[in-house]
Regions:
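Conserved glycine-rich Rossmann-like NAD(P)H-binding loop of the short-chain dehydrogenase/reductase
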Residues: 29-45
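The beta1-alpha1 cofactor-binding region of Rossmann-like NAD(H)/NADP(H)-dependent oxidoreductases
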Residues: 59-69, 101
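Residue(s) in the substrate-gating loop at a strand-loop-helix junction
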Residues: 139
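Substrate-binding pocket helix/loop in short-chain dehydrogenase/reductase
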Residues: 95-96, 103-108
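Conserved glycine-rich cofactor-binding loop
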Residues: 15-16
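C-terminal helical subdomain
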Residues: 180, 199-244
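Active-site helix of classical SDR
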Residues: 119, 156
Length: 248
């Protein structure tokens, strides 16, 4: 496992779920963590549960100024950025023909473009340092079509994996690494707040016992930060699903 004591980490989508668990995990290992998300009250709850110093930055990642604020406040506080965790994202459930153009744009703005543009804002800091890690939260849905009625979500997460691969090629030899974590279904509030949540509820309930906990996913990611593979599976479940369905 990578030594994290004193490392400066930005975690987006840190107000709940995998993001909150990652923030706590990094802090437990001695990292200095910037917590970024829209819900300031929830960020402060997470901050109180962290063991080391944290910085709370309420931010809407779709706003360029908010992305710049995350970078500026982090470097002003700690002088560097060692790890960027692009975790913020959304789900979407519904028949393809009923998924509007606006919905497609929304999920790509949230799951891909906010990640791309925050990475662009952070990379100059890492390039000056000559080292860093960009950790992108994708999904098993970024590798296979893991369910029905999630075409928009699957497309956006495939784009995240593709972005990660392309970025890794561009950054080869710079000292900056890229990882794409691909968890399976995780027991978080993610599903409750996704468009189509009501229709998706029976499916979520059906697979509840098969879901990973956000704590297990976060720990699995932390354990693989030094992986020489670009795509990492936080737990055994997504790896098994991928092997079973990869040719479908």
């Amino acid at each position: 496992m990578v030594a994290l004591n004193g490392k400066v980490v930005i975690v987006t989508g840190a107000s709940s779920g995998i993001g909150a668990s990652l923030a706590r995990g990094f802090s437990r290992e001695g990292a200095l963590v910037t917590l970024a998300a829209r819900r300031e009250d929830r960020l402060r709850e997470v901050a109180r549960s962290c063991l080391h110093e944290v910085l709370v930055v309420p931010a809407d990642l779709l706003r360029p100024q908010d992305r710049e604020t995350i970078v500026q406040e982090t470097t002003a506080r700690w002088g560097r950025i060692d790890i960027l965790v692009n975790n913020a994202g959304m789900g979407m459930y519904g028949p393809f023909l009923q998924t509007t153009e606006a919905a497609w744009r929304q999920i790509f703005e949230t799951n891909l473009f906010s990640m791309v543009f925050l990475t662009q804002a952070v990379l100059p800091v890492m390039q000056t340092q000559g080292e860093g890690l960009v950790l992108n939260l994708a999904s098993i849905g970024g590798l296979i079509a893991h369910a029905e009625k999630v075409a928009a979500y699957v497309a956006s997460k495939h784009a995240v994996v593709g972005f990660s691969r392309g970025l890794a090629r561009d950054l080869a030899g710079t000292g900056i690494r890229v990882l794409a974590a691909c968890p399976h279904l995780t027991a978080t509030e993610f599903f409750r707040f996704s468009p189509g949540a009501e229709e998706m509820a029976p499916t979520v309930e059906k697979f509840k016992s098969f879901m990973d906990s956000p704590e297990d996913v976060a720990q699995g990611i932390l354990n693989q930060l030094d992986s020489d593979r670009l795509v990492v599976f936080p737990t055994a479940k997504p790896a098994k699903v991928f092997e079973k369905q990869r040719d479908i």
